[in-house]
């Protein structure tokens, strides 16, 4: 019953004349009066099966009751199609199967949506509710196959380079690493909780202290944070750590791994070494710490050209220590009306901009509401600074440098998509380096780690740790692909006194540091090697390599934007007996 000689999509003309056994699902059924045609589908593709009374009346009789998504066991002979019926859109389009027998292995109800990539758009909620049906679609299968191929390529590369695949705990200690932890109550230890790991960070460092030298793991991680299209509450990262390696060594090995992945999955050779860009340069030129370099429209600082202008918004921004930044949207002046530009201003306001000034370049000079403030040499300076030509649209934000960069960076991406400036066939990798070690929150009056508390400062900057910590640079590096952060890494602190000082900078008391990380600090007392590593988001990498725009399309059973599973209806309530065992009581909010 379960012997199979071919997958449906792999039968070629070489098999003509053979009797084959196939298994699969009914994609489509057509009754032409006397003959019935079925497209039989499995994970490899589709093959046409013909039920002909001259071949088997019993098979034809069974086929009359068959409907879409029935699971069939078919035996038949491979024959060549007549030339007029060849289907060039199918790999198997030059052959068909003359059915000699058919068994219905499983009947099926009419599915809530067509199992086809060409079907009318179906709401994502319906797809997620019936995920087992959605996964039958070829594009979904291909996304998960890409995930398998990427993982396989990563494992092969790391295995060949002397890394050991080591699992780290999933039930661990709650430590502050940025997002909220998912907590797991302990039945045995009343009132105490495990946390699901946000990353294996501390454990992989301890493995280096243990002398394992090269570690990797395809690691499941969990973060209870607000979701968006490229985030999931549970996600997978390619986690790597190495001893006695410099930042250069780790970056070199990481990009060689990515080159191997691209070669194995896409047959593409990427040029090494990958481009590098400083954090400061990325923010100032692209308005983003994960720049999309597939198109231009770079940010330009025009503060010098406008600081003495009569337009007070510009002049005062510069005088108050801010900046005037601009982008030149080449040839777009005619495409954007005043109403359109107002909408762009509203968009920029979402990123903190108080306004969006604009000018259009025409043959006889600059036009627009602020053009009167820029005549003669001032106009020439602005045109020259922005390389403006007839037909260009110039957009300006005058504000604190960070606000101007953020707003114009977001606007640049929006316009790049609207104007089809992005070559979707490109895979533009780059490194962002020279990160600040710390970020200062003026409202709270404290520092936060720009990456995490275990990142080593640049050695030359260690002398600033007690006097000017805000000036310290990190030995950190982020890998970016097409405007998405694939992941980041750093050289780690491996000296106890430096780690203690870092905890102090971040607001930990000595007691808090010992409570949270005492085991790590103690490990450093027993001879810790210099070490570092990187973690790359597998879900996001697969999303980009498979041409998807949503992480959920690269995960077999993902969560929604509200961190729920529509198929299993998780999370769900549990009964009181389970709560009692865990020494828990639900305190419900009173709704007003």
From Swiss-Prot:
Membrane spanning stretches: none
Entry EC number(s): 6.1.1.12
Compartments reported by the entry: Cytoplasm
Keyword set, alphabetical order: Aminoacyl-tRNA synthetase, ATP-binding, Cytoplasm, Ligase, Nucleotide-binding, Protein biosynthesis
Primary localisation category: cytoplasm
Chain sites annotated for binding L-aspartate: 177, 223, 451, 492
Region: Aspartate, residue numbers: 201-204
One CC-aspect GO term: cytoplasm
GO molecular function, one term: nucleic acid binding
A single BP term in Gene Ontology: aspartyl-tRNA aminoacylation
EC category: ligase
Subunit structure as annotated in this protein's UniProt entry: Homodimer.
Reported function: Catalyzes the attachment of L-aspartate to tRNA(Asp) in a two-step reaction: L-aspartate is first activated by ATP to form Asp-AMP and then transferred to the acceptor end of tRNA(Asp).
Xref: PANTHER family: ASPARTATE--TRNA LIGASE, MITOCHONDRIAL, ASPARTYL/LYSYL-TRNA SYNTHETASE
Protein name: Aspartate--tRNA ligase
Protein source organism: Bacillus licheniformis (strain ATCC 14580 / DSM 13 / JCM 2505 / CCUG 7422 / NBRC 12200 / NCIMB 9375 / NCTC 10341 / NRRL NRS-1264 / Gibson 46)
Gene name in the database record: aspS
């Amino acid at each position: 019953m379960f012997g199979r000689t071919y997958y449906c999509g792999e039968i070629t003309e070489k098999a003509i004349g053979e009797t084959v056994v196939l298994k699969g699902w009914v994609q489509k059924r057509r009754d032409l009066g006397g003959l019935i045609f079925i497209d039989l589908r499995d994970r490899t593709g589709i093959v046409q099966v013909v039920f002909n009374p001259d071949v088997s009346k019993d098979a034809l009789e069974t086929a009359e009751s068959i409907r879409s998504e029935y699971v069939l066991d078919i035996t038949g002979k491979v024959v060549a199609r007549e030339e007029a019926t060849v289907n060039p859109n199918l790999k198997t389009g030059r052959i068909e199967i003359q059915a000699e027998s058919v068994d219905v292995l499983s009947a099926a109800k009419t599915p809530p949506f067509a199992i086809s990539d060409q079907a009318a758009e179906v709401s994502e909620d319906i797809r997620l509710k019936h995920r087992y049906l959605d996964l039958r679609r070829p594009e979904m299968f291909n996304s998960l196959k890409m995930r398998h191929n990427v993982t396989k390529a990563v494992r092969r590369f790391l295995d060949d380079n002397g890394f050991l695949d080591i699992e780290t705990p999933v039930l661990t200690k709650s430590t502050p690493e940025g997002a909220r932890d998912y907590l797991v109550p302990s039945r045995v230890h009343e009132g105490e909780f495990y946390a699901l790991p946000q990353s294996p960070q501390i454990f992989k460092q301890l493995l280096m202290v243990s002398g394992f030298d090269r570690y990797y793991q395809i690691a499941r991680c969990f973060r209870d944070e607000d979701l968006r299209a490229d985030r999931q509450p549970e996600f997978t990262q390619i986690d790597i750590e190495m001893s006695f390696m410099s930042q250069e060594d780790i970056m070199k090995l990481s990009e060689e791994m990515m080159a191997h992945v691209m070669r194995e999955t896409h047959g593409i050779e990427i040029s090494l070494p990958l481009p590098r860009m400083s954090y400061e340069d990325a923010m100032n030129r692209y308005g983003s710490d994960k720049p999309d370099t597939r198109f231009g429209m770079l940010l330009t600082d025009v503060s010098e050209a406008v600081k003495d202008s009569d337009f007070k918004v510009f002049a005062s921004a510069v005088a108050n220590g801010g900046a005037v930044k601009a982008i030149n949207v080449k040839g777009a002046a005619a495409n954007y009306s005043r109403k359109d530009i107002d909408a762009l201003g509203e968009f920029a306001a979402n990123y903190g901009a108080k306004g969006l000034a604009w000018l259009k370049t025409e043959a006889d000079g600059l036009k627009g509401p602020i053009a009167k403030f820029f005549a003669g040499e001032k106009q020439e300076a602005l045109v020259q600074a922005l390389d403006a030509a007839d037909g260009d649209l110039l957009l300006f934000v005058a504000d604190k440098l960070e606000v101007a960069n953020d707003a114009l960076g977001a606007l640049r991406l929006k316009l790049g998509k609207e104007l089809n400036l992005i070559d979707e066939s490109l895979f533009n990798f780059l490194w962002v380096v020279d990160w600040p070690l710390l970020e200062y929150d003026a409202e709270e009056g404290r520092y936060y780690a720009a990456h995490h508390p275990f990142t080593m400062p640049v050695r030359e900057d260690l002398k600033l740790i007690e006097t000017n910590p805000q000036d310290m640079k990190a030995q950190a590096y982020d890998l970016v692909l097409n405007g998405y952060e694939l992941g980041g890494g750093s050289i780690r602190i491996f000296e106890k006194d430096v780690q203690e000082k870092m905890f102090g900078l971040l607001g930990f008391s000595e007691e808090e540091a010992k409570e949270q990380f005492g085991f790590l600090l103690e490990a450093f007392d027993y001879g810790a090697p210099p070490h570092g590593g990187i973690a790359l988001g597998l879900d996001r990498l697969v999303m980009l390599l498979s041409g998807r725009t949503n992480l959920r399309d690269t995960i077999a059973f993902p969560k929604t934007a509200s961190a729920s599973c529509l198929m299993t209806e998780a999370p769900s309530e549990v009964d009181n007996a389970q709560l009692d065992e865990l020494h828990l009581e639900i305190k419900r909010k009173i709704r007003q």
